[in-house]
A protein has these predicted regions:
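Alpha-helical scaffolding within the catalytic cores
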Residues: 53-54, 82-95, 174-188, 221-227
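Intrinsically disordered, polybasic Lys/Arg-rich low-complexity tracts
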Residues: 433-477
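Metal-dependent polysaccharide deacetylase catalytic core of the NodB/CE4 family, i.e.
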Residues: 72-146, 189-209, 234, 238, ...
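Flexible loop/turn segments at secondary-structure boundaries
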Residues: 13-15, 76-80, 110-112, 148-152, ...
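Generic structural signal for well-ordered alpha-helices
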Residues: 52-56, 88-92, 121-131, 154, ...
């Protein structure tokens, strides 16, 4: 029996305002609030909200027989909370159905997995906290920014406790193999890989309304027939796409919503099920290893990282940004931490691409700038001001060795505090047990005359105040 695995990406960056050279050192607010409000509100009204309503209607109609997964960046969630709070509520309704899974990713939709492993781990943890805070779900499957993946990343993902990762079924890593199987990482054998079926995904997200396409118009029954006609042993079809496919990239008038609504009915006729990524991982075995020595992604024709790191402008900007990572992680300034995340969004480097032809048109379509050079200049002006603010707290006179020593001290203190908190909790539990044991339950006299609670027996194990003092000292270090 075949299964379809749907995954939708939602991401919006905090776009930068026009930031001049003369603003450096004087203006510490970098964002175009009007553009951010207008863009996410428009997309939510055209796409996110009606698509959520569509999915909720489908789940009510088909129950557990229809399931999907989402990956929503932290920066998108923040903007949706500010500008379109009704989206968060509608997503909570979807989460409550039990038919929607939330995937993990980097909070800032960043390139940290390629540049800064410590930052990568920190962002993934922050993202998952945000998902649990809003939707009450703990992600167990990981998807990196723009499906960026290689063997080194798989090792980090497995170490964070994830059971699987989804990425692009790039032709140059597949060779003769099919994306319609579950694979595993050669360096993280417990981590299962789910590969995007690029053709079938792009048939919906990019070609659906293209009247010049040989298969136009695409109907639900035709599409399900394509999946059903795949070789019998190919049991899985991963359909990964941007959520804007519904209503934004493919307008409502194209029939995209009606197409989606009809899929479960025709799938059921062919015996095709819908699985979430975690269900795929639990129900399907890996058929073998899939080595990925160099990073891949789902962007551009090359399916590599050249969309963000393909020219000297991009490389210089990324290098400058991550050169201050350790210093930023030492900062306690909330605004600096926030700006650090917002400036890491991969979109800023995507706008700097100098590619031509079809790839170039995609980059220019999404960019708010006239040229890649304008994008670079504006970003570097902002980054220069940001670096000044960081250096005011941790000057360049403090070398990396001293910084590493500070980081080590902070980590040791954090571990010590965690250990002390565990000890305090154990002592508290022991005190509760001792107190409970002091009350005899079989004496009638206890019922006739109320008595004051006896104090807990003092024993060497119950020196709680001393533990508190130790905790305070550890905190002040």
């Amino acid at each position: 029996m075949k299964a379809i695995c749907f995954y939708f990406q939602i991401h919006q960056p905090f776009r930068l305002k026009n930031y001049r050279f003369f603003d450096i050192g004087n203006d510490h607010y970098y964002y175009d609030d009007f553009a951010n409000d207008e863009i996410i509100t428009r997309i939510a009204q055209r796409s996110y909200l009606p698509a959520n309503a569509m999915l909720l209607e489908m789940i009510k109609q088909y129950g557990k027989k229809f399931k999907v997964a989402f990956s929503i960046s932290g920066t998108a969630l923040e903007q949706l909370e500010i500008y379109v709070p009704e989206f968060i509520e509608s997503m909570k309704d979807l989460a409550d159905t039990g038919c929607v899974e939330f995937l993990s990713e980097t909070y800032a939709h960043s390139l940290a997995s390629l540049e800064d492993p410590d930052e990568f781990v920190a962002q993934v943890k922050d993202h998952d906290k945000k998902i649990f805070q809003l939707f009450g779900k703990h992600p167990v499957v990981f998807r990196n920014t723009e499906l960026i993946y290689d063997d080194d990343i798989s090792a980090m993902v497995q170490n964070m406790g994830f059971k699987g990762v989804i990425t692009e079924g790039a032709k140059h890593i597949l060779g003769w193999k099919s994306p319609n199987y579950v694979y595993s990482s050669p360096v993280a054998p417990k981590l299962k890989l789910l590969l995007k079926n690029s053709k079938l995904s792009d048939d919906i997200s990019f070609r659906f309304s293209n009247s010049d396409w040989a298969s136009y118009p695409l109907t639900a029954d035709k599409y399900i027939d394509w999946i059903a006609s795949l070789p019998e042993e190919e049991q899985l079809v991963n359909l990964f796409m941007n959520y804007e496919t519904f209503g934004e990239m493919q307008p409502r008038e194209s029939g995209i919503f009606e197409f989606m609504k009809a899929l479960p009915r025709f799938a059921a006729e062919k015996g095709i099920e819908f699985f979430t990524p975690s269900e795929v991982i639990s129900k399907m075995k890996s058929v073998g290893e899939m080595p990925v020595m160099h990073p891949i992604s789902w962007a551009d024709e090359a399916r590599d990282t050249s969309a963000w790191l393909g020219n000297t402008l991009q490389q210089e900007a990324v290098k400058k940004l991550y050169s201050i990572g350790e210093r930023v992680r030492l900062c306690q300034d909330r605004r600096i931490k926030q700006d650090w995340y917002y400036l890491q969004a991969s979109d800023h480097f995507f706008y700097m691409s100098t590619k031509h032809n079809e790839d170039g048109s995609v980059h220019s379509h999404y960019s708010p700038y006239d040229s890649p050079y304008t994008a670079f200049t504006n970003y570097m002006n902002v980054l220069s001001d940001f670096m000044i603010r960081v250096q005011e707290q941790y000057p360049e006179s403090i070398d990396n060795e001293e910084l590493n020593a500070l980081l080590l001290t902070i980590r040791n203190q954090s571990n010590e505090i965690s250990q002390l908190n565990r000890e305090v909790e154990m002592l508290r539990n022991n005190i509760v047990k001792d107190t409970t044991g002091d009350f005899p339950v079989d004496k009638p006299a206890a019922e006739e005359k109320p008595t004051k609670k006896a104090p807990a027996k003092k024993s060497p194990a119950a020196k709680k105040p001393a533990a508190k003092k130790t905790t305070k000292k550890a905190t002040k270090k």
